[in-house]
Amino acid sequence: MYNLLRKIALTLYRPFMKEKMKTFINKRLSQDFSDLKDEEYIWIHCSSVGEVNLSEDLVKKFYSISRKNILISVFTDTGYENAVKKYSDKKKIKVIYFPVDDKKKINEILNKIKLKLLVLVETELWPNLINEVNEKNSRIIVVNGRISDRSYPRYKKLKFLLKSMLQKIAFFYMQSEIDKERIVSLGAIKEKVENVGNLKFSISLEKYSDIEKKEYRKFLNIGDRKVFVAGSTRTGEDEIILDVFKRLKNYVLIIVPRHLDRLPKIENLIKENNLTYVKYSDLENNTSTGKENIILVDKMGVLRKLYSISDIAFVGGTLVNIGGHNLLEPLFYRKTVIFGKYTQNVVDIAKEILRRKIGFQVENVEEFVKAIETIENEKNSDEEINSFFEENRLIALNIVKKENLIMNNIKEEAKDLWKHFFHSEKSNYNMYMYKLLDYPEYIMYDNDVMKEKKSKWSEYFGNSDQIAVEIGTGSGNFIYQLAERNPNKNFIGLELRFKRLVLAAQKCKKRNIKNVAFLRKRGEELEDFLANNEISEMYINFPDPWEGTEKNRIIQERLFKTLDKIMKKDGMLYFKTDHDVYYNDVLELVKTLDNYEVIYHTSDLHNSEKAENNIKTEFEQLFLHKHNKNINYIEIKKIV
């Protein structure tokens, strides 16, 4: 019925189509999919640029954790261009236009690839796409599912059609409790629906250094003035913004309209208010005097960078009945956000912002000015904003971890795993090698995957916290306790033995510890997966002393040459050993190094001032139980 109605509608409408619409459809139906491979794919479908940005963290985590090809389909032109630009450097990510739910084109794609998972971002429910993927017995999920106030009444009228389609979807990860209730009321199976929170909370945006921000202010030619950014403004909001601006002193106003076709109207408003302005494009041509009151942005893609240097940040679509745009972008750059009363599109986020007092909701000029005065006079809310993102940053990661477990056929994957390690087929096996597959959220064993993490560990962990490495993590007793004590640091444990890796991962999973990753790597391979200045700490506990063949020890001059590259200035190396000669040799070695100094050492750790906070390794506990032997301990600082 759907396809018949679709065909009739297209046939009747085609003669009246404008050329722009014909081009839009032809572009999507004439795509060449010959470069798609007969390999496993995850297909992620986004409607527009908003969903492309929203799903970025999700895409990156699927890409890094699943090791599968990613196919991204996008409905709009701007969304497609944004996705192509975003993933142009990723060989295993392919971006296409969504083929407007054309059954033939969808099957052309499905017949070329081995689809493991279809991810529908927000509520992109296309009947042919869902039916054909379901026919192939591939899993379908909805991520960041949302049923808006406007859509819900329409959907209720179509419930008799929607129910069968919704029941073909394996799982719904919904934004809020109300969205969960609505999708269930429309026919989704209750047990397959979960409120996981809004994926927007899990955003990972571009970061700018202090030098970059200083240079950007110089480019904007704004001197020492404070910056008031009005982002994504809509018709009816600019008048209010201008009235507020006229009440401020020593500010430059930067207006970023949601749609650039409104620029002429905004220019007229500025002139009517007897204010001066320069267009962003004029700044690029060096035609600014540096004295203009306002910068009017006539370019796409610069709003986030502007938020990063702002003193006051307003998000549009909220002073008029639009429903609000992305309130999280200013917060990501640790800016207290101001918005209006119309937040129906971002209602959960708005409520959380107000609850935490990291933003202000205003209805008029007076309230707006008062909010600005409060921001200027009160202490920075960085700590609360950090807490806000920290608590919500794991939404995408948790979805990916769960789906990756479901996707993997353990027997087939295990066969590939054996080949990966031993390059042959064998019937006998180490049972713990196969158990690595049960902990993809913790354990990495593929060298290519680990190399991809180089310089990108902050993306993997979902934050920019300090990174510490433990060489020889054993069964994880030391590192899991260290991670529990230090939730604002990330930890990477290196271990070669399968059983130890599995036991370490089990300890972390049991305690829901998220800031740890385990790599099947040697300590000599640090530069394979760590970039320059990427770590702040290293722990080496009870390494083999290699008596008689000391050249094999891990702590030698070559380790410090590696630390010269991968460790930040003021970074720390912590070393424990029961071997007195090894202890003294390390002390002597550090004396010969210009870039390092010993800031603390003791030959009897358990009777020192460091004993109280010492975390005992498995070996340390066993050794203390069986022997009455002193434990040596050294703290080494990188001073250059």
UniProtKB/Swiss-Prot annotation:
InterPro entries: Glycos_transf_N, Glycos_transf_N_sf, Kdotransferase, SAM-dependent_MTases_sf, tRNA_(Gua-N-7)_MeTrfase_Trmb, tRNA_methyltr_TrmB_bact
Presence of keyword Protein transport: no
Gene3D superfamilies on file: 3-Deoxy-D-manno-octulosonic-acid transferase, N-terminal domain (3.40.50.11720), Glycogen Phosphorylase B (3.40.50.2000), Vaccinia Virus protein VP39 (3.40.50.150)
A biological-process GO annotation: RNA (guanine-N7)-methylation
Binding-site positions, S-adenosyl-L-methionine: E470, E495, D544
Protein known as: Bifunctional glycosyltransferase/methyltransferase
Any matching Pfam family: Methyltransf_4
tRNA (guanine-N(7)-)-methyltransferase: annotated segments: 439-640
Annotated function: Catalyzes the formation of N(7)-methylguanine at position 46 (m7G46) in tRNA.
Catalytic activity, EC: 2.-.-.-, 2.1.1.33
Keyword Metal-binding: no
Catalytic reaction annotation: guanosine(46) in tRNA + S-adenosyl-L-methionine = N(7)-methylguanosine(46) in tRNA + S-adenosyl-L-homocysteine
GO molecular function, one term: tRNA (guanine(46)-N7)-methyltransferase activity
Annotated keywords: Methyltransferase, S-adenosyl-L-methionine, Transferase, tRNA processing
Binding site for substrate: D578, T617, E618, F619, E620
Class of this enzyme: transferase
Active-site residue list: D544
Region Glycosyltransferase, annotated ranges: 1-438
HAMAP family: tRNA_methyltr_TrmB
Family according to the record: In the C-terminal section; belongs to the class I-like SAM-binding methyltransferase superfamily. TrmB family. In the N-terminal section; belongs to the glycosyltransferase 1 family.
